[in-house]
Every structure is written in structure tokens, then in C-alpha cells.
């Protein structure tokens, strides 16, 4: 009877693994690699939400990673004939595009260390913004490096299963959530796929929520300093992981 119970439990565990879509990854090394990638992507999602709020508070309701909103406001001010009000949005959009361009150049230059190279460059850009605020340059110019950093971040391809995660396109995350729920209900995808989408969105909103609470009471320079410290720690962790898991790049 005990032997029968053991086989039943083993069968149930295997079925749960298949249901969640983890069967192909059920080795300690691969599972840890996947978990590390998800954690990194969640951190980057929270970071983009956090930095977006800094832009909303710091430069008059302008987004630093949400270019759809900036493009809409650019068009609105152009239609109203308010060209001076439209100009900062144009600068932000151009900075985001330049960030994507820079990210692709970095990827081409360091194909074997993409994550590390992109994160290091992103940290340097945030440091530039930190120093500009420190030098009392507190207008739109001090936030442009942050927008470049957000465009840069979107060139990272953190692949988990069939998803590329860790970007700042949260409209895309919500779209993916809807389609993945449909696919899971049709049994074409595991339920782990929409759960991951939901988790990424919740973490991004949480990052923005945290910045919204802290920003009124803590100077932007201090918040960026904390972001820099955390990013440096993440870079150190990635270097350590690269030694243990060569495919974590």
C-alpha cells in the first residue's frame, strides 16, 4: 500500500510539472538558471516603473520609458501650436531611440556578455543623470540619460521559455497576458506563461508605486543613488553567476 501511495504522489508531482510547463527544465542547473533570469527580469521591470515615476514628478508629467504617452502628448501640443511645449517630448523620444541604437551597438560589440555590457552601460547613464542633478542641472536635460537607459534596457533579450522579458513595454506584457490566458485555456500553453506575465506587470506597478511614495519625501538624487548601488550589486551577482552558469548571459 505504501509503495502504491508513493507512485501516486510521484505521478501527481510529474503531472504538476507538466501542467506548469517545467518538465523540460526539471534539472537543478537549468531550473536555477531560469529562476535567476526571471528574478533579473522582475528587477528590471520594477526599475523601469520606478524611473518612470521619477520623470513624472521631476519634469512635469513626462514619461521616461512610456513612449506611447510621450508621442501622444507630442502630437497634442503640435496640434495646439504649442511648439515649445512639444519640444521636450521630442527630445525624450529621440533619447529613447538613441538608447535602443546604443544598446544594439553594445550587443554587437560584446556578443558574449550582453547582459553584463548592457547593465554596465545603463548604470553609467544613470550615474550621468545622478551627477547632473548633483551639479544642480534639474531641468529636462538631467533626465535624458535616464530615457536613454530605458531605451537601452529594451535591447536586452532575457529569454525564458518562449518569452523575452525584462523590457519596458508593459502594454505588450498585458497583451501577452491576455493571449497566454487564451492559449492556456486551450491547453496550447502552460498556465505558468500568463502567471509570469501577471507577475511582471505587478512588479512594474509596484516599482512605480514605491517611487510615488518615496519621491515626495526623498530627493531624486538620493533615490538615483540607491538605484546605482542596487545596479552595481546586480552586476556583481551576474559576474558571479557567469562563472557558475556560462549560459547566463
Whereabouts are the PLM-identified features?
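Short, Lys/Arg-rich, polar N-terminal cytosolic tail immediately upstream
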Residues: 3, 9-35
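Helix-to-loop junctions at the C-terminal end of transmembrane segments
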Residues: 101-111, 215
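Cytoplasmic membrane-interface "Motif A"-like loop-to-helix N-cap segments
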Residues: 108-121, 220-221
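Symmetry-related core transmembrane helices of the 12-TM Major Facilitator Superfamily/SLC fold
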Residues: 224-236
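Perimembrane loop-to-helix junctions flanking transmembrane segments
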Residues: 65-83
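Hydrophobic core of transmembrane alpha-helices in multi-pass small-molecule transporters
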Residues: 46, 139-165
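C-terminal ends and interior cores of transmembrane alpha-helices
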Residues: 124-137
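Hydrophobic/small/kink-forming positions within alpha-helical transmembrane segments
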Residues: 97, 101, 201, 205-206
